């Protein structure tokens, strides 16, 4: 499938702060974007979703996906946009029958719970995900060079959790039962997932994504040893297949494992440019463990955004200071991208997000003065 677009189809980038920080180059201030920044906390998102009629109606319609991706960029002076989509588009394209019931999470009509179901799994035809790649190109054009566009996917392990459980889970009983009793089946699922995710992200890059992120949302539920074997190894398998550059521009690769603080040393060896951290990790300690080969992204607790603007600014300052002095020289050095430690809550007051963005930009400029 050819999803490739020529870079001349897009306006030149006006704000490359995020991409420079990803590549460990000096910037005038610390860039900020937020996981789930296009979402229910914005009244304009809720209005567009009502028009679309459902979550998948939103995600599969190029115009709606473009509209909601741009909403936070138009409202706040953030430094990157992230594609509006869902991590479960890939298993849906495998024929698992994804649906979103109102007020409930995602569900699969055909979970992968036995040998026969695993035997039927294959890397999906990327044409089934054409709506995602069309959205990437549409968003990139609509951004008109304002900020870079991040593409993303779930990690092989996180997708596997949903595929085996058939939905979200509190205890991961079904997927862990398979992992321990039939590791051969679990590995087969993860191999197919890794190769699917690599093709999916490469197609997003060809369509116009300027960075890509792998969300390992459920890596942290694994035991030590199991994490390395069933999550980290397959994230590495994805990274090994990803395009390093497109149309002459480097494409940064970001990996975020929620609950991955235990394994920073191993994650520091991944072939990626940026490690995303949740709020349980101290940035200075992470920097010491990971070394200067990776930029760090994170990691304020999203619930700080329910405090007052003054308290939000104080906490943002603390997070920035905990990373330490950002790099200011030639070449490359330690850099930080400000983000939350997980997705923003749908109940967050938008004006509190505005206060956060302002505080991050102001304090991080002072740090470089």
Curated annotation (Swiss-Prot):
Keyword Lyase in annotation: yes
UniProt pathway: Porphyrin-containing compound metabolism; protoporphyrin-IX biosynthesis; coproporphyrinogen-III from 5-aminolevulinate: step 4/4
Molecular function GO terms recorded: uroporphyrinogen decarboxylase activity
Enzyme class, UniProt record, top EC level: lyase
Residues annotated as site: Transition state stabilizer: 86
Signal sequence interval, chain numbering: none
Subcellular location: Cytoplasm
Disulfides per UniProt: none
Recorded GO CC terms: cytosol
Record GO biological process: protoporphyrinogen IX biosynthetic process from glutamate
Pfam families named in the record: URO-D (PF01208)
Record bears the keyword NADP: no
Assembly and interaction partners: Homodimer.
Family note: Belongs to the uroporphyrinogen decarboxylase family.
NCBIfam families, alphabetized: hemE
UniProt-listed HAMAP family: URO_D
UniProt name for this protein: Uroporphyrinogen decarboxylase
Gene transcribed to yield this protein: hemE
């Amino acid at each position: 499938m050819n999803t490739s677009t020529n870079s001349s189809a897009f306006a030149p980038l006006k704000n490359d702060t995020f991409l420079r920080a990803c590549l460990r180059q000096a910037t005038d201030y610390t860039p900020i974007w937020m996981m789930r920044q296009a979402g229910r906390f914005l009244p304009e998102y809720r209005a567009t979703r009502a028009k679309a009629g459902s979550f998948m109606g939103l995600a599969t319609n190029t115009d709606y996906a473009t509209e909601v991706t741009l909403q936070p960029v138009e409202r706040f002076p953030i430094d990157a946009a992230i594609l509006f989509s869902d991590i479960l588009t890939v298993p849906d394209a495998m024929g698992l029958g994804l649906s979103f019931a109102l007020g409930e999470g995602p569900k699969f009509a055909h979970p992968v719970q036995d040998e026969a179901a695993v035997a039927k799994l294959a890397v999906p035809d990327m044409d089934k995900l054409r709506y995602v790649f069309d959205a990437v190109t549409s968003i990139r054009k609509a951004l008109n060079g304002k900020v870079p566009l991040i593409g993303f996917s779930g990690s092989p392990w996180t997708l596997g959790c949903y595929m085996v459980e058939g939905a979200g889970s509190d205890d991961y009983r079904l997927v862990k039962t398979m992992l321990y009793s039939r590791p051969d089946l679990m590995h087969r699922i993860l191999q197919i997932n890794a190769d699917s995710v690599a093709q999916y992200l490469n197609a997003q890059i060809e369509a116009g994504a300027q960075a890509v992120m792998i969300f390992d949302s459920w890596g942290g539920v694994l035991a030590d040893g199991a994490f390395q074997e069933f999550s980290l190894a397959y994230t590495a398998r994805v990274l090994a297949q990803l395009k390093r550059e497109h149309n002459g521009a480097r494409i940064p690769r970001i990996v975020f494992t929620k609950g991955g603080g235990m394994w920073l040393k191993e994650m520091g060896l991944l072939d990626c440019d940026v490690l995303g951290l949740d709020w349980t990790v101290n940035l200075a300690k992470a920097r010491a463990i990971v070394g200067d080969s990776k930029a760090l992204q994170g990691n304020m607790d999203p619930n700080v955004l329910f405090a007052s603007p003054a308290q939000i600014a104080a906490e943002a300052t603390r997070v920035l200071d905990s990373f330490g002095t950002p790099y200011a020289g030639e070449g490359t050095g330690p850099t930080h991208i400000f983000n939350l430690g997980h997705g923003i809550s749908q109940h967050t007051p938008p004006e509190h997000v505005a206060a956060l963005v302002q505080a991050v930009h102001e304090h991080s400029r002072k740090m470089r003065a």
